[in-house]
Regions:
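Membrane-embedded alpha-helical signal segments
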Residues: 1-44
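Contiguous, well-folded functional domains in the mature portion of proteins
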Residues: 38-198
Length: 198
């Protein structure tokens, strides 16, 4: 089709691909996003180390503990997950919003230093069709670490039976020599959780 987009592989590949393509097609031209990401990553080659902050107040757990094989098996990348205590999501890095899923339960970011971060609010929450998710950003928007990017009805979703454990994964983990999990347990927004080494 001319311009290409990166697809995150795993059992969700069909859903993820269709949602990403749908968003990029209907909300912003693909070439605009590509240009913004290109401008955003000018310092990528110079960066040797990068940290990823906690995006939600709650309890950090290892990705292997998430009750979904796509995440626990590392199929979508390395990272961590948070059991949230409040329904507010903040940017874990300085960078650009690469994509917001049509159902608003997930988004992808690219940091100014090249990390591709996928945040998935809860498990199976795609089934809500966007209900209870209030995105504050759109694809192509620049954000600062600690900036509020989404609010969601945490208690309502729990009452409806959803597990709101939120995976945060580095989808381009193969570009790093190592990824170190620095903290497990209770965390506040902005605390360093992952360190990425080139």
């Amino acid at each position: 089709r001319g311009n290409s987009i990166q697809i995150i592989y795993g059992p969700y590949v069909t859903v993820l691909k269709s949602e990403l393509e749908d968003y990029l097609r209907t909300r912003r031209a693909k070439k605009e996003i590509k240009q913004l990401l290109k401008e955003n990553t000018h310092s990528k080659d110079k960066m040797q180390q990068e940290s990823i902050a906690c995006p939600i107040k709650g309890c950090v757990i290892e990705l292997e503990e998430v009750g979904d094989e796509a995440f626990s098996g590392g199929m979508l990348g390395e990272g961590f997950a948070v059991k949230p205590e409040e329904g507010k999501l903040y940017a874990p890095v300085d960078g650009i919003i690469a994509a917001v899923f049509r159902t608003k339960h997930a988004l992808a970011m690219e940091s100014k230093d090249g990390a591709e971060v996928l945040i998935h609010l809860g498990l199976d929450t795609v089934k809500r069709g966007g209900k209870g998710f209030y995105m504050k950003v759109e694809a192509g928007q620049k954000v600062k670490k600690g900036e509020l990017i989404c609010e969601f009805d945490l208690e309502d979703m729990r009452v409806d039976g959803y597990v709101m454990t939120t995976p945060v994964v580095i989808s381009n983990n193969a570009e790093y020599a190592s990824i170190s999990l620095k903290h497990i347990g209770e965390c506040n927004v902005g605390e360093e959780i992952l360190t990425l080494y080139k």
